[in-house]
Amino acid sequence: MKPEIIVVTAAYGHQKVAELGGQQALLPIIAEAGADGVEIRRELLSEAELQSLSQLADAIAEHQLEANYSVPDALYVANGLVNPQLDRYLQEAEQMGARLLKLSLGDWRPGAVMPLATRNVKLVVENDQTEYGTLEAIDAFFSQRQPLPGMTFDMGNWLWTGDDAVTAAHRLAHHVSYIHVKAAIPHGDSWRAIALDEADDSWRALLNLLPGTMPRGIEFPLQGDDLVAVTRHYVDLLREE
């Protein structure tokens, strides 16, 4: 069974998304490129769009795409408290017809309350680029003996936290329910995401350590004069990899 390929709208760049008229304008490109779904980013939605998510849901359905919803916020806020905005984010995900809501972990503490989505929306936690997204923190969270959210394994973010991605894959693969495919190179004192064709083959080896049937999200730069062709190239590459 080949994995679903999801296109993250942010892969086109914030400026390009704005130039095209917002994330809804990307749906024809993503659908024509043969992708299975789209990841909608909350930070790229205007206030007006947040008030009309059902229209976005209709457009996604018209293009026969699945939807994931990414929110640039954490599951836990200070001192291990569940984010008070969680229910709002779940409602937004439901309104746009998303099947999962992706958050970072945040300031989780052992013994903290474990929220699980009660709607038809799956909750997933991603390793982000902060101190809360280190392998030590993520591994501790997913080592709990209780029902847990799924994991979004971001292949590139381990570079930002100074962790070894291969070690992370060996430890966490059985928790992974969504993969963000990303390659990066050094950039000043940090890292910069690059297209897979510009990267070495280490991303292939890492991807092969992760569950082969889980959805793969394109979260590296998609740029060029023909966005459909560029997107299709990577959709096909990741589907066959």
Predicted regions located by residue number:
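Histidine-acidic metal/acid-base catalytic patches
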Residues: M1-A33, S46, G97, L135-G150, ...
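N-terminal pre-domain/capping segments
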Residues: M1-G80, D87, E94
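Active-site acidic/histidine proton-transfer and metal-coordination neighborhood
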Residues: A59-A67, V71-G150, W160
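Active-site-proximal loop/turn and secondary-structure-junction residues that shape catalytic pockets
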Residues: A11-G13, R42-L44, D73-L75, L105-R109, ...
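Short, aromatic/basic amphipathic alpha-helical patches
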Residues: S54-I60, V113-L116, R232-L238
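Conserved beta-strand positions in the central sheet of alpha/beta enzyme cores
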Residues: E39, N68-Y69, K102, V124, ...
